[in-house]
């Protein structure tokens, strides 16, 4: 695969109308309507008519004439502040690695290295369960820094939270994002007991990972991590162990990385572009994003082939895209940050998400209570209709405007990449819907495992 593939998808994804997007696939001609994220098969004559309507600025008229010109499903009104249903605790604002691009600035978020006291963690849990209410659902995540630096507090808080949730009939799920260097057999047993979703940060094969995620001494960390992971990968029943790969200019061989980690036994493998880093180190530039899209499409096409053949291929980005398209995902925000999801610093300060810990841009109160005024302001300002370039983009309700942290601190350098990826995903969806409709019916294919 060459960059010509990525450039073709980027060109095909370019916004010609904020209301519709036209696609062609092996199955024919298709219309994507931004309002409601609806996808239709259309006859060639209507396809041509819609293309002409874009050029003549008459899209609304044509949509109304064919019966899909409904009133907007998303207006300019910000989302009313919902109850908090998910918290991520920066339970250790310290780390034993010296990752070259770390947004948390080696784990301490630009401040003094510290652990979260158990009293602060318990207050955060109390806030979460109070917001969830009896019989509700909630999620508790542990991040850092490296959360296992503060293992005793993590374990005690988890056990207490599980007991309190059970008494109140709250379905509470747990997750952790770890660098993997401190994992042990005992951790595997603990995570399995509590059904943790474990995400391990890995940047590729040894020679790549050790350049971008070394110890602070400069020594490589890959071999130790893979040894530590063996007991976790071997006992995935209630627990799920996934790999998260941060893409920098150092590690753009996505297909090799995906195949290696699938073979290692991970529940899922996902890629995330590095778009905003302190000092800019490791950030992807335009040429890098073209290379990444090449790799993503290569992995996506492999996913298509494997899925049609009835084989498991847990490419998380592709699985999520297929599920989002299938259910008509349609949202005014990219995620729940600042709404139902907040981050908590080691000192008990609330932030819009884990990436805004210690950042005044995303301050949201303390574990004593959410600052509803700041939250309301955030939800008003971060609405996709308030993001100038997004209002002219057909993909705005699939994308939601892009990661808040990245767009606030760097802008939107990846829009062409995102649209190119979504254009490919829409065509892949149309193919798979015809070849494997049962996979979508099951809707449980969170890892690409056929029913």
Where do the model's predicted regions map?
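Flexible mid-to-C-terminal extensions adjoining Fe-S/redox cofactors in radical SAM and related proteins
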Residues: 14-17, 355-451
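A broadly conserved sequence feature marking short terminus-proximal activation segments
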Residues: 54-69, 333, 338-374
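C-terminal accessory regions of radical SAM enzymes
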Residues: 32, 304-357, 386, 391-404
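Radical SAM/AdoMet-radical enzyme domain recognition
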Residues: 121, 125-141, 150-274
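N-terminal [4Fe-4S]-dependent radical SAM core
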Residues: 7-41, 54-88
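Radical SAM enzyme [4Fe-4S]-AdoMet core and its adjacent flexible, acidic
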Residues: 6-7, 211-223, 230, 234-337, ...
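Cysteine-centered iron-sulfur cluster-binding motifs in ferredoxin-type domains/subunits
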Residues: 91-98, 149, 338, 390, ...
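Canonical Radical SAM [4Fe-4S] cluster-binding loop centered on the CxxxCxxC motif
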Residues: 82, 88-119
């Amino acid at each position: 695969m060459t960059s010509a593939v990525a450039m073709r998808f980027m060109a095909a994804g370019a916004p010609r109308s904020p209301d519709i997007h036209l696609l062609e696939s092996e199955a024919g001609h298709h219309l994507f309507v931004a309002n409601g994220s609806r996808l239709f098969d259309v006859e060639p004559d209507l396809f041509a008519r819609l293309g002409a309507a874009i050029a003549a600025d008459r899209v609304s008229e044509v949509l109304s004439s064919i019966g899909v010109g409904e009133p907007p499903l998303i207006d300019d009104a910000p989302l009313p502040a919902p109850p908090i249903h998910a918290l991520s605790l920066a339970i250790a604002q310290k780390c034993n690695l010296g990752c070259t691009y770390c947004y948390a600035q080696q784990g301490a978020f630009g401040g003094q290295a510290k652990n979260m006291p158990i009293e602060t963690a318990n207050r955060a849990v109390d806030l979460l369960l109070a917001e969830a209410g009896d019989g509700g659902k909630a999620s508790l995540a542990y991040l850092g820094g490296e959360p296992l630096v503060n293992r005793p507090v993590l374990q005690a808080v988890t056990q207490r939270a599980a007991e309190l949730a059970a008494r109140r009939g709250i379905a509470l799920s747990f997750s952790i994002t770890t660098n993997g260097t401190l994992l042990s057999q005992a951790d595997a047993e603990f995570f399995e007991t509590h059904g943790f979703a474990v995400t391990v940060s890995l940047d590729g094969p040894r020679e790549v990972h050790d350049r971008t995620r070394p110890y602070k001494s400069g020594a490589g960390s890959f071999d130790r991590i893979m040894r530590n992971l063996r007991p976790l990968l071997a006992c995935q029943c209630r627990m799920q162990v996934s790999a998260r790969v941060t893409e920098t200019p150092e590690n753009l061989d996505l297909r090799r990385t995906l195949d290696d980690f699938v073979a290692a036994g991970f529940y899922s493998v996902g890629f995330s572009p590095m778009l905003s880093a302190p000092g800019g180190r490791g950030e992807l530039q335009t040429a890098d994003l073209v290379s990444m899209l090449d790799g993503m499409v290569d992995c996506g096409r492999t996913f298509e082939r494997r899925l049609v053949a009835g084989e498991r291929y847990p490419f998380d980005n592709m699985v999520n895209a297929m599920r989002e398209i299938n259910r008509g995902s349609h949202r005014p925000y990219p995620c729940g940050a600042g709404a139902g999801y907040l981050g908590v610093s080691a000192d008990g300060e609330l932030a819009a998400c884990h990436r805004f810990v210690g950042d005044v841009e995303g301050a949201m109160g303390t574990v004593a209570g959410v600052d509803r005024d700041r939250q309301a302001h955030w939800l008003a300002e971060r609405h996709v209709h308030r993001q100038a370039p997004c209002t002219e983009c057909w993909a705005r309700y699939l994308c939601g405007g892009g990661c808040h942290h990245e767009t606030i601190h760097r802008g939107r350098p990846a829009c062409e990449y995102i649209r190119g990826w979504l254009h490919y995903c829409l065509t892949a969806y149309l193919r798979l819907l015809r070849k494997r409709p049962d996979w979508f019916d099951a809707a449980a294919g969170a890892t690409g495992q056929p029913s």
